[in-house]
Amino acid sequence: MMLGTEGGEGFVVKVRGLPWSCSADEVQRFFSDCKIQNGAQGIRFIYTREGRPSGEAFVELESEDEVKLALKKDRETMGHRYVEVFKSNNVEMDWVLKHTGPNSPDTANDGFVRLRGLPFGCSKEEIVQFFSGLEIVPNGITLPVDFQGRSTGEAFVQFASQEIAEKALKKHKERIGHRYIEIFKSSRAEVRTHYDPPRKLMAMQRPGPYDRPGAGRGYNSIGRGAGFERMRRGAYGGGYGGYDDYNGYNDGYGFGSDRFGRDLNYCFSGMSDHRYGDGGSTFQSTTGHCVHMRGLPYRATENDIYNFFSPLNPVRVHIEIGPDGRVTGEADVEFATHEDAVAAMSKDKANMQHRYVELFLNSTAGASGGAYEHRYVELFLNSTAGASGGAYGSQMMGGMGLSNQSSYGGPASQQLSGGYGGGYGGQSSMSGYDQVLQENSSDFQSNIA
């Protein structure tokens, strides 16, 4: 039996999937058949720590019968979005509202703000000038980098007091150089999740003499299943993707880094088909510098995407179409340079219409021309910075011509041809190297045994 408000549980439902711009009036209209306690005041929206709508809300109703009516609205649409309705209670509602939003204990009173959209190569001195007149604590500026040592376009700044931090927030959308800077409330905990790169990677920058593909818990093993989703979160989605979850060594599912200490989130993010299965759509890049988008509104056009990245000028936009002929909510955006692609990542989690969009970097410094295909494959990733022709083709190992030979969970003979200029990775073009490749592969297998 459901207890009344005096018993502590109340008559509460939780709503998920609301449009980001949803108002209390719209929620009231959605539940027009139900009696909401205190009208609009009985609708409690949930916000992120940056103060943005999360797409969820609690609704307080007047009786158990009203709760039952509200639950019948589950999976009905608001605009063009399906809205989920769950049974909840006062205890859950109070806890969630206390621990989320910009004024939660995790974000209040520590003087931190997060900057997004910094120009490529922005220095701490430029940030100090940007906040001229506002006191920053000593060593209070943190500039996160990715696993390749590149700037993420973000920064964390700790001010001498929360009051000063509040003043800093008023500089939201002001410029550094030609870039608009977004400023959000932050916390020490958020800084730690973005800035503590795994120390073990430092010892993995160069391959050892006995490194070999596919050996046990080796760095090349690419698993399937839960690890893919963890990988897809990427370093820009809070934390460091697959590494934090699996300590970088995979254990057969998910992956953190390859033999050379590179984060595989960057190399494999941007794959198209999320059914963890067979292939998917293929996008051919002419520059090798792409950003993959996920979470687009289904009515988004190419022009919307060009405007989203303004003032950057993408070379080309490719909106993905699924096997059923419908848009997937994903797209690939090609840029002229690696620097432009990195700068575009500053728009990660920014809104397009009512949805926030996730971005995944698919660019390698120094890559020039050549096409790559992003598909789900069971091969380990072979990619070298500065490769010409096809940045995702083959990698020569020790001068022995061992390229695209070993696979994880698939036939050892599976090939991914098209490496250097489209003719140096496949079996048919290896000619005299075939025998060497086979002998080396056999040696590796015997070493493993």
Swiss-Prot record:
InterPro entries per the UniProt record, alphabetical: ESRP (IPR050666), Nucleotide-bd_a/b_plait_sf (IPR012677), RBD_domain_sf (IPR035979), RRM_dom (IPR000504), Znf_CHHC (IPR012996)
Covalent cross-link (Glycyl lysine isopeptide (Lys-Gly) (interchain with G-Cter in SUMO2)), residues: 35, 87, 98
Region annotation 2 X 16 AA Gly-rich approximate repeats: where it falls in the sequence: 234-433
GO biological process: mRNA splicing, via spliceosome; regulation of RNA splicing; RNA processing
Tissues expressing the protein: Expressed ubiquitously.
SUPFAM superfamilies in the cross-refs: RNA-binding domain, RBD (SSF54928)
Segments forming a coiled coil: none
Residue ranges constituting the RRM domain according to the UniProt record: 11-90, 111-188, 289-364
Segments of this protein annotated with the region 2 X 19 AA perfect repeats: 354-392
Modification Dimethylated arginine occurs at: 233
Residues found modified as Omega-N-methylarginine: 233
Localization per Swiss-Prot or TrEMBL: Nucleus, Nucleoplasm
GO cellular component: catalytic step 2 spliceosome; cytosol; membrane; nucleoplasm; nucleus; ribonucleoprotein complex
Sequence repeats: 234-249, 354-372, 374-392, 418-433
Expression induction: Up-regulated in myotonic dystrophy pathophysiology (DM).
Modified residues (Phosphoserine): 23, 54, 63, 310
Residues annotated with N-acetylmethionine modification: 1-2
Record-linked SMART domains: RRM (SM00360)
Record keywords: Acetylation, Disease variant, Intellectual disability, Isopeptide bond, Methylation, mRNA processing, mRNA splicing, Nucleus, Phosphoprotein, Repeat, Ribonucleoprotein, RNA-binding, Spliceosome, Ubl conjugation
Domain commentary: Each quasi-RRM repeat bound poly(RG), while only the N-terminal QRRM bound poly(RC) and poly(RU). None of the repeats bound detectable amounts of poly(RA).
Function: This protein is a component of the heterogeneous nuclear ribonucleoprotein (hnRNP) complexes which provide the substrate for the processing events that pre-mRNAs undergo before becoming functional, translatable mRNAs in the cytoplasm. Mediates pre-mRNA alternative splicing regulation. Inhibits, together with CUGBP1, insulin receptor (IR) pre-mRNA exon 11 inclusion in myoblast. Binds to the IR RNA. Binds poly(RG).
Subunit details: Part of a ternary complex containing FUBP2, PTBP1, PTBP2 and HNRNPH1. Identified in the spliceosome C complex. Interacts with IGF2BP1. Interacts with CUGBP1; the interaction is RNA-dependent. Interacts with MBNL1; the interaction in RNA-independent.
Name the UniProt record assigns to this protein: Heterogeneous nuclear ribonucleoprotein H
